[in-house]
Amino acid sequence: MTHRIKPVSYEALYAAHHGEVLRLCRLLLANHHDAEEIAQEVFLKVYQQFQNMNQTELMMWRPWLIRVSVNACRDRRRSGWWKLWRGANEEYQEANYPNSSRTPEEMVLSREAQGRIWRAFEKLSARQREVFVLRHVDEWSTEEVAEMLGITTGSVKRYLFRAARHLRRILGDR
């Protein structure tokens, strides 16, 4: 029996994965505007490579897309202007959309808790954040994370252990 692979369009890939790439970039860069810019750069690279990809590569492109996204975020963090900008703008401002089902007190407490978690998360090393997000937020296996980042599974486990230990220490074991 022959299995036909349904042709995949660039538009379909973009629609299916743009949100995921944007979320990953926001978590790694802690800045919505930078994340949007990097996500656009990532999909520009995807568009440039799309014509050269065969159907098998297109069907298994998600790990490649994540790897390209992580590398683009790393490049942004390494750039001199970004370091200057981040130093001058320490507070990460997340848009807070009102939720009418919660009281103002609950909303304030929720924002405070989110702020505490975010500040603790930002204190992780860049590699710890990458590994933590890919493993626990995006739910990739340890082996997949290792392959995407070009490190061993032992290194992934070590980064996860250190990240969890750091977060427990900062946030308390609640």
Please annotate each region the language model reported:
Residues N52, R67-A88, S110:
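Arg/Lys-rich amphipathic alpha helix in sigma70-family domain 2
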Residues V70, R74, E143, E147-D173:
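DNA-recognition helix of helix-turn-helix
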Residues M1-R23, H33-A39, Y47, R119:
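A short, charge-rich alpha-helical start-of-domain segment used by transcription regulators
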Residues T2-R4, F43-M60, S79-W81:
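Sigma70-family region 2
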Residues H18, L22, F43, S125, ...:
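C-terminal flanking helix
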Residues K83-S110, S141:
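Internal acidic/polar
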